[in-house]
Amino acid sequence: MTMRPVVTYVTNRKRTPPGHDILGRRAVAARLAAMRGAAYKGDWDGREAYDAPPYFVPDDALEVGRAHRLGIATADDLFGGVVPHAFVATKAITHGLCRDDATAPEGWSREMATCVGDAVLRGYTAFSRDDALAAVRELLDGGEARIKRCDGIGGGGQEVVRDLDESARVLDPLDDEALAAGGIVVEENLGDVTTFSVGLVTIGGLALSYCGTQRTVRNGHGHEVYCGSTIDCVRGGFEALAAHALRDDVRRAVDLARRYDAAALASYPGVYASRRNYDVASGRGCDGTLRVGVLEQSWRPGGASGAEVLAIEA
């Protein structure tokens, strides 16, 4: 039987990702190829006649239409995920809308907020400037708010605001059309934060789940951004991970990630993924109380993927 070649796939060639992101994804693809006894063929080329349908390692979750055109029909066809709409791959789905008449894109699930419940922090997703300001007003009653671009990664594209003037400074430059399509998240701001990474990877019938903590560093703009994770892995799914967790904070992070995972898959049934990762924040609210909640999902290769593949090989 001809083994399926492994290829990397770039979703948007107009966007230039960081060099370490490209190199990291190629290294993951090469390891996956070796593990599968197949060849790594570099970036996918639509003009090439592959000996067998490729196994894809994309740089982002794929919309279902594009996935089908590439021959991706199940989670076994890629290291990553497939979504019914582009916004479903972002942190937009973490929160509900701030009011009943708020605007939302086609395919938006109002059930997600109900399903996920208190597994997330207090916050809202907005697809218009007016809705975003309404969300900010409500959250500022409880202290500071964090405004987050839905497509931001690694902690980028975020600003903490303390009043409406600061909020306007952040929101005014936003493009209305992009806001209507992609949205913006307004969320309570936490201090003294620890961020857990909880994930599940399935490759070739093998399942690996893990929980770890993230490390951050200040970038050139003075913002805290992701710079790596330390993870503990177990064979099996989230149930095995929950049984393995010894510390209370780890068990809680795993439980919240499982609830978010179930809510997302139930609310957006077109999602399938071989890599499902969830960031869970634990920190202090402005009133000093401990707050814990899932920040976002990642259904694409990420910063921990190199370790994930090595662990599943072990």
Say what each PLM segment does.
Residues D151-G152, N189-V193, G270-R275:
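A short catalytic or substrate-binding loop motif that flags glycine-/basic-rich loops and adjacent residues
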Residues T2-Y40, W108-E111:
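Short, charged N-terminal beta->alpha structural module
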